[in-house]
Regions:
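Amphipathic alpha-helical scaffolding segments
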Residues: 86-93, 108, 113-116, 212-217
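Long, hydrophobic/aromatic-enriched structural stretches that serve as scaffold segments
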Residues: 39-103
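Short linear sequence motifs
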Residues: 9, 17-20, 60, 93, ...
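Short, glycine/acidic-rich hinge or "gate" loops at secondary-structure transitions
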Residues: 84-86, 102-114, 258-267
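Residue-level detector of alpha-helical recognition elements and their boundaries
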Residues: 79, 106-107, 210
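Intrinsic-disorder/low-complexity, polar/charged segments
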Residues: 85-86, 93, 104-110, 223-234
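Secondary-shell segments that build the walls of catalytic and ion/ligand-binding clefts
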Residues: 1-53, 118-281
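A generic secondary-structure signal for well-formed alpha-helical elements
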Residues: 95-106, 199-203, 253
Length: 281
């Protein structure tokens, strides 16, 4: 692989983030009049709940961008062969969740339902963390907050979310798995599973995308032969990771722009320019 081609791929992500970040920040998260978002904020029974959903989704775009910046760092010399896949998986996950909350195909009631489910999922995980701290963090305080959110959900007309044993499993709705959300919003289940294989260090994934065989039939232990591998990442893999990052970031931004009534053209042009920089073999 040539250093020039790698440099252009890395620069494509950096340029994309710089250009789109300026445009996105310029709108100051304020929806235009007559946009879907403006109508939801003025018509929903509790505008604060709509605002919470928008804030959650916008934060997730920030998270996705942070992972994208980290990708650049992991691919800059001395380049890593495993960490970049973790960055892109995090970017894909955050972008998909943002799209799920910014979804332009749902109404305000469904948006708040999803927002409540996302809040419950996070607090439920926080409560489990608290239970491991041996009293440093009181899980009862977190469960109290969950109860308050569930009460709010019921006041807004959402029924309790219980399993067959009458145990609470969500608020608003049961939270779908990230894999299902990635498939629903980006149709990238295959790529997400590949990235997950690398993140979880499965041998089949590492041997294909994180290492290269250098020697075979070598004595590794007494009476044991095997192969030696070295960490390695190909130009094809780098290009895949960069394109995946740019594409999922674009789709999340597009959903936000469409919902808030902003002009998507500068973002689309920045995306095309970034992808065009990448030299495919």
């Amino acid at each position: 692989m040539t250093k020039n081609a790698i440099s252009k791929s890395i620069s494509s992500v950096e340029d994309f983030l710089e250009q789109t970040g300026k445009v996105w920040a310029g709108y100051e998260h304020k929806p235009f009049p007559n946009s879907i978002a403006a109508k939801e904020l003025s018509s929903f029974i509790r505008p604060e709940s709509i605002g919470t959903a928008y804030s959650q989704a916008a934060t997730l775009i920030e998270v996705a961008a942070d992972y994208a910046f980290a990708l650049k760092s992991t691919l800059t010399e001395p380049a890593q062969s495993i960490a970049p896949w973790t960055c892109v998986r995090g970017c894909l996950e955050a972008a998909s969740l943002s799209m799920w909350l910014f979804d332009t195909k749902i109404d305000a009631k469904e948006r708040v339902r999803r927002s409540l489910a996302f809040r419950y999922e996070g607090l439920d995980q926080q409560a489990k963390l608290a239970e491991t701290t041996k009293g440093i963090v009181n899980p009862k305080d977190i469960h109290k907050r969950i109860n308050q959110i569930e009460q709010l959900a019921q006041e807004l007309g959402y029924p309790r979310v219980l399993n067959k044993k009458n145990k609470r499993i969500g608020v608003g709705q049961e939270m779908p798995s990230v894999t299902k959300i990635v498939k629903k919003m980006l149709n990238k289940e295959q790529n997400y599973r590949l990235l997950s294989g690398m993140v979880h260090a499965h041998p089949w994934a590492l041997q294909h995308f994180g290492f290269i065989q250098t020697h075979s039939e070598q004595i590794i232990f007494e009476n044991v032969k095997g192969a030696y591998f070295e960490k390695h990442i190909t130009l094809d893999s780098i290009n895949f990771l960069c394109v995946e990052t740019i594409q999922c970031m674009f789709e999340a931004l597009k959903m936000n722009f469409d919902l808030f009534g902003w002009d998507i053209k500068p973002i689309a042009l920045a995306t095309k320019s970034a992808v065009d920089q990448i030299q495919f073999e």
